[in-house]
A protein has these predicted regions:
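Glycine-/small-residue-rich beta->alpha transition segments that form the dinucleotide
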Residues: 2-4, 8-16, 27, 31-34, ...
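Dinucleotide-binding/catalytic capping subdomain of oxidoreductase cores
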Residues: 20, 24-26, 30, 57, ...
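A short, basic/flexible loop-to-alpha-helix module at the beginning of a structural domain
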Residues: 35-54
Length: 186
């Protein structure tokens, strides 16, 4: 299953998809997602703003907004989980693990454990890269947790993003997004 789906179905005049659960938690219009990410400052490491994103991410659409949404999601995810870990560790140091986790619901606990696990893995990769004198490899971790996939109903070469700016699409693919061809939401 997927935890987040971004609907990128027309920036100028968005297409409303007639699909079940189109307004369920975790489903957002891409323009709303991108504006919230930028305007809240959630992507800034020193910001206390929070915008929860979980992996895997599916972006429905084939335009440049879909490309931006997928790449911004992948870029934001490590920041989000590392901020969560930093806050968690500070609260545990001040209060205790039991006190911090006492009021968590079952769902909150599952999400927290996921975020902490991913943040520890990212921290470990950063430490290993520094020790070994190599670049940090976060993208393979993100992909192993589900990554971000653009679901488009046609072929990549037929997508508006590719016909308008294939260089941006190529760069996004290099940054770790996946492009699913011939996919239509039910």
């Amino acid at each position: 299953g997927f935890d987040h789906i971004a609907l990128c179905v027309g920036a100028g005049g968005p297409t409303v998809l007639d699909i079940p659960n189109g307004l369920a938690r975790g489903v957002r219009a891409a323009s709303d997602f991108l504006m919230a990410l930028q305007l809240t400052g959630a992507a800034k490491a020193d910001s206390i703003a929070n915008m929860q994103v979980r992996l895997p991410i599916v972006v429905v659409g084939g335009g440049l907004t879909a490309i931006d949404t997928a790449t911004e999601s992948l870029a934001y995810y490590p920041i989000q989980v590392e901020k969560f870990l930093k806050r968690y560790e500070a609260l545990v140091a001040e209060h205790s693990r039991e006190a911090v986790e006492r009021s968590w619901s079952q769902e909150e606990r599952a999400i927290a454990e996921e975020f902490l696990s991913h943040a520890y893995a990212i921290r470990s990769e950063r430490d290993d890269a520094a020790t070994e004198g190599r670049p940090v490899r976060i993208v393979p971790l993100l992909q192993s947790w589900g990554g971000a996939t653009i679901a488009y109903r046609r072929l990549l070469v037929d997508s508006p993003s590719y016909t308008l700016n294939h260089e941006e699409v190529e760069k996004a693919l290099e940054e770790g997004i996946w492009f699913g061809e011939g996919l239509t939401p039910l």
